[in-house]
Curated annotation (Swiss-Prot):
Belongs to the PrsA family. This is Foldase protein PrsA. It comes from Exiguobacterium sibiricum (strain DSM 17290 / CCUG 55495 / CIP 109462 / JCM 13490 / 255-15). The lineage of its organism: Bacteria, Bacillati, Bacillota, Bacilli, Bacillales. Residues 1-19 form the signal peptide. Residues 140-231 form the PpiC domain.
Length: 304
């Protein structure tokens, strides 16, 4: 819970502007509103003002675009859900302060912003009937398989030869498989549906007519697998009508998790014609440049 509140704190910061001039002076303009100096106040303004201006702008635009979709009651319910995870109010307040959040009122604001961003992601995560049907078809068939995983192809070929000559699959798996999770069970992976294993593994495991057969070595990112499919079946009482809502929700959550918040911010800035009036803030609003710099940093770290 502390980690959750600490992550929330990143959105919560409200800084005091040390620069001179009126607090009503706009630093960002957009259709139907503005962000002024009072929105980004703090003594740390000189260092963090640009980033705070960006965050305040995005908060206001999220509110403008999605505010009607998040009610006060929903926010209050989320706050209560969080508070209920603490033994008492004192510990809750202490954790808030540790996370840099002054009080419960401020926490409500932070939580509301997160809920607005979630709404924005959901708007970009529509699920089609075909996607639901495809996932249903994936899930209704499950197979049971065992495998032996080794690092080198030469070792996999030698093991396959042993098996072709009558070697015991379970005994060899226990002795030689590097997948410690299944090796102790003779390589048994149990039943699984499509989407649970890597693609190369599934391409063999879900092929028709492979039950009881032993595959040639199959290469994946983990090494070389020798697979034995021992059963294949369709789930009982598993209908599209019963599973549709669950699948739709799961797909929407998966899609939402893949949405880049910067894509949301770009579309909002374009829609509301955001103009950065303060030249010191321009880089904070240049998301393409920031993403480019992050990629360069990641490449440099990988090379080290």
């Amino acid at each position: 819970m502390k980690k959750k509140l600490l992550s929330v704190a990143a959105v919560a910061s409200v800084f005091t502007l040390a620069a001179c001039g009126s607090n009503d002076e706009a630093v960002i303009n957009y259709k139907g509103g503005e962000v002024n100096k009072a929105d980004v106040q703090d003594e740390a303004y000189q260092k963090a003002g640009a980033q705070i201006a960006f965050q305040q702008t995005m908060n206001k635009l999220l509110e403008k675009e999605y505010g009607k979709k998040v009610t006060d009651k929903e926010v209050e319910a989320e706050v209560k859900k969080t508070k209920d995870q603490f033994p008492d109010k004192e510990q809750f307040n202490t954790t808030l302060q540790t996370a840099g959040i002054k009080n419960e009122k401020e926490f409500e604001k932070v939580l509301r912003t997160q809920m607005l961003l979630k709404e924005a992601k959901s708007a970009k995560s529509k699920v089609t009937d075909k996607e639901i049907e495809d996932r249903f078809n994936q899930e209704k068939v499950e197979v049971k398989a065992s495998h032996i995983l080794v690092e080198k192809e030469s070792e996999a070929k030698a093991i396959k030869k042993q098996l072709d000559e009558g070697g015991d699959f379970a005994k060899i798996a226990k002795a030689k498989s590097t997948d410690t999770g299944s090796a102790t069970k003779g390589g048994d992976l149990g039943y699984f549906t499509k989407g649970k294993m890597v693609e190369e593994f599934e391409n063999y495991a879900f092929k028709d007519g492979v039950e009881g057969k032993i595959s040639d070595p199959i290469k994946t990112q983990f090494g070389y697998h020798i697979i034995k499919v021992t059963d294949r079946k369709e789930k009982k009482d598993f209908t599209l009508e019963k599973e549709s809502d669950r699948i739709k929700k799961a797909l929407a959550e998966e899609k939402s998790a893949q949405v880049n918040p910067n894509d949301i911010y770009r579309s909002l800035m374009k829609k509301y014609d955001v103009k950065v009036e303060n030249k010191d803030f321009k880089d904070a609003f240049d998301l393409d440049k920031q993403e480019q710099q992050q990629m360069q940093q990641q490449m440099q770290q990988q090379q080290q």
